[in-house]
Design a protein with these regions (language model features):
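Non-catalytic terminal regions of proteins
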Residues: 60-257
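Short helix/loop segments within enzyme catalytic domains
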Residues: 2-58
Length: 257
């Protein structure tokens, strides 16, 4: 890079450090709050973004495998590399899969990887690439092997979930917010109700929180689309039932105050 030779390990560490905010949002704000539903939500969203001008069925590659970097002069007068904060979509999916493995959901993690490999297009990429954001002549394309990024993903996911943090009173994020098999069972139950057009929350299944409803909405929408329902029709059904469920959760909470 420039006149310097950078070891791959340093480059990989730098990439994860520069993108850790978005990675943590996926792990903590996605997987730990909504469980496997987040993988479907994420993959559907990325696919929609990347096909909005052509439509999903006319777009071969639904997940991005490239991004950009910046070179800026630091206080010492040297040029410093920084990766843009959003990791390419394909790698984000594999990081989410690593987080699902970490919370004990290997089957869902496998599903995430399979869907990502399908959505990425003609073939699974060998490298993820970054180009200079300004298109400056002479600056190289940075290429990091996909397999190396994947191998590092479980360590990154585990650190984000399990590392005690001073800001949280020396407990980990995974001790504050978490998704368990019990959480998933509630979300699956609600998803079945939504797909049937039912919105009355059960009173014999323990506490139901808005996170259960939100996760269920993603699962139900995915389920309807997979069964052949037109996406717009499915969205209308899920929106109506999910909003009614959220109203009930809010009313229950306000009654307890």
């Amino acid at each position: 890079i420039g006149k310097q030779r950078v070891p791959l390990a340093n480059l990989l560490t730098k990439m994860y450090a520069d993108t850790i905010g978005e990675v943590d949002a996926d792990v903590s704000g996605g997987v730990l709050l909504a469980g496997p539903a987040f993988l479907y939500n994420m993959l559907m969203t990325f696919s929609a973004f990347n096909s909005r001008r052509r439509g999903v069925f006319n777009q071969r590659q639904l997940l991005r495998t490239s991004s950009f970097y910046e070179m800026e002069e630091n206080a010492n007068g040297q040029m410093a590399l920084s990766f843009l904060p959003h990791p390419p979509d394909y790698i984000r999916a594999h990081i989410v899969a690593a987080a699902l493995d970490e919370i004990g959901m290997p089957n869902e993690a496998k599903q995430c990887r399979l869907l990502a490999d399908q959505a990425v297009g003609w073939k699974v990429p060998e490298f993820i690439t970054w180009d200079d954001v300004n298109g400056t002549k002479g600056r190289p394309t940075i290429k990091i092997p996909v397999e190396d990024i994947k191998r590092a993903a479980p360590f990154v996911a585990r650190a984000l979930i399990r590392t005690p943090l001073e800001s949280l009173g020396k407990v980990s994020t995974g001790e504050v917010i978490y998704w368990t098999p019990k959480s998933e069972a509630k979300a699956q139950m609600l998803a079945e109700m939504m797909m049937d057009g039912e919105s009355q929350l059960p009173t014999d299944k323990g506490d139901i929180h808005v996170t259960h409803v939100i996760a269920a909405a993603s699962l139900a929408y995915w389920g309807l689309c997979k069964s052949g329902t037109q996406p717009r029709d499915g969205a209308a059904v899920i929106e109506a039932t999910a909003l009614k469920m959220i109203d009930q959760v809010r009313n229950t909470f306000e009654t307890r105050k």
